[in-house]
Amino acid sequence: MLRLDLQFFASKKGVGSTKNGRDSIAKRLGAKRADGQFVTSGSILYRQRGTKVHPGLNVGRGGDDTLYAKIDGIVRFERLGRDRKRVSVYPVSQEA
């Protein structure tokens, strides 16, 4: 005698709608000031996780790796070698 065990239908039928539908909100990471822009002391320049961009001259790094300006000045995004980036703030000269 030949015994066949065939299954034609799904054992669970479409019971996933309440298990789907989760998505986390965006964290709003990235550059907050552009290259060449004037910033005041304490301004957030770059929000990040880890050190995608490193702090340069007159730039501090917060506990969550956020980069902020230590002085008033002009923002400059620079490259360090092939694969590292740095952001610095240079003071504005007082000639006018």
Swiss-Prot record:
The N-terminus is cleaved by ribosomal processing cysteine protease Prp. GO terms for molecular function: structural constituent of ribosome. Residues 1-9 form a propeptide. SUPFAM superfamilies: Ribosomal L27 protein-like. PROSITE patterns: RIBOSOMAL_L27 (PS00831). Keywords: Ribonucleoprotein, Ribosomal protein. GO terms for cellular component: cytosolic large ribosomal subunit. It holds the Pfam family Ribosomal_L27. One of its GO terms (biological process) is translation. InterPro entries: Ribosomal_bL27, Ribosomal_bL27_CS. Belongs to the bacterial ribosomal protein bL27 family. This is Large ribosomal subunit protein bL27. The gene is rpmA.
